From Swiss-Prot:
High-affinity glutamine synthetase which catalyzes the synthesis of glutamine from ammonium and glutamate. May contribute to the homeostatic control of glutamine synthesis in roots. The gene is GLN1-1. It catalyses: L-glutamate + NH4(+) + ATP = L-glutamine + ADP + phosphate + H(+). One of its GO terms (molecular function) is ATP binding. It comes from Arabidopsis thaliana. Residues 19-99 form the GS beta-grasp domain. This is Glutamine synthetase cytosolic isozyme 1-1. Homooctamer. Interacts with CRK3 and GRF3.
Length: 356
């Protein structure tokens, strides 16, 4: 195995100018990720330098067999933490040969929102808190849990340390460093309330880059869990009962909110979000009704509520924002399996472009 390890870690830049580009896209479920690699003649610094590519959409649930070709458009580049050197990860979106976005391509519509001059002028910032659960591969039960049984009640696990409280830290730390290497603006990690559940944060990131970075961070996490022999779940309520669910809280601000008098802008934006609560809930992730129960630090899915420092609210405003009269707010409704292209663009559209 030492030769295999040596080859995996082989530095190609010592012997060739060629690089490997791993093209990544979202699969047919809207949550699964796919990727394949190609050789390029030399280093690349911008997506516009990359060729489009294609794949068999009939094998991913994205095209019929008789017309199966789907075209990948490169959109964002990251350093490859697995191959290293000049090799890259490429986040793509998917189109028909005629140039129409396929139904699972949510980036295309998001890009239209973020390129709107009114949105661009507000320089929207996002900080996304991505929660996930690590599962034992063969039994699909959280790591650290006895097979067919349960650990002690919640309480000691949040940000906990020790072999009886923290499960999967090697995976989490590997992911943290790999994201930093890749150029993702990952800002932190922590153990969550349910044992075997973790969170990483991406941001602040501007506009559509926040969603690109979340997707690539998810991809890197899937690759690391593949190596580690565990399974990552983005199910918003992986274990029924008295256990916390998994969300993807979205922290958000605009230029106007970050400036003097911004708190009034924040309150107006929250009012707008309340008026479109049902539309946002419908777009914030599948199975979210199992998580948004009014318990375990959530608001009830049918009720819109906001408050300062209230983790049982739909929207939480921080004490610092209230005190300083400017800042950001946190939308606590998105589920862990949400599509960040949909969530980030919808928040911008509702708060900046929509007039009730």
């Amino acid at each position: 195995m030492s030769l295999v390890s040596d080859l995996i870690n082989l530095n190609l830049s010592d012997s060739t100018d060629k690089i490997i580009a791993e093209y990544i896209w979202v699969g047919g479920s809207g949550m699964d990720m796919r990727s394949k690699a190609r050789t390029l003649p030399g280093p690349v610094t911008d997506p516009s330098q990359l060729p489009k590519w294609n794949y068999d959409g009939s094998s991913t649930g994205q095209a019929p067999g008789e017309d199966s070709e789907v075209i990948l458009y490169p959109q964002a580049i990251f350093k490859d933490p697995f191959r290293r050197g000049n090799n890259i990860l490429v986040m793509c979106d998917a189109y028909t040969p005629a140039g129409e976005p396929i139904p699972t391509n949510k980036r295309h519509a998001a890009a239209k929102v973020f390129s709107n001059p009114d949105v661009a002028a507000e320089v929207p910032w996002y900080g996304i808190e991505q929660e996930y659960t690590l599962l034992q591969k063969d039994v699909k039960w959280p790591v650290g849990w006895p097979i067919g049984g349960y650990p002690g009640p919640q309480g000691p696990y949040y940000c906990g340390i020790g072999a009886d409280k923290s499960f999967g830290r090697d995976v989490v730390d590997s992911h943290y460093k790999a994201c930093l290497y890749a150029g993702i603006n990952i800002s932190g990690i922590n153990g969550e309330v349910m044992p075997g559940q973790w969170e990483f944060q991406v941001g602040p990131a501007v506009g559509i880059s926040a969603a690109d970075e979340i997707w690539v961070a998810r991809y890197i996490l899937e690759r690391i869990t593949e190596i580690a022999g565990v399974v990552v779940s983005f199910d918003p309520k992986p274990i029924p009962g008295d256990w916390n669910g998994a969300g993807a809280h979205c922290n958000y601000s605009t230029k106007s909110m970050r400036e003097e008098g911004g708190y009034e802008i924040i309150k107006k934006a929250i009012d707008k979000l309340g008026l479109r609560h049902k539309e946002h809930i419908a777009a914030y992730g599948e199975g979210n009704e199992r998580r948004l129960t009014g318990h375990h630090e959530t608001a009830d899915i049918n009720t819109f509520l906001w408050g300062v420092a209230n983790r049982g609210a739909s929207i939480r405003v921080g004490r610092d924002t209230e005190k300083e009269g400017k800042g950001y707010f946190e939308d606590r409704r998105p589920a862990s399996n949400m599509d960040p292209y949909i969530v980030t663009s919808m928040i911008a559209e509702t708060t900046i472009l929509w007039n009730p």
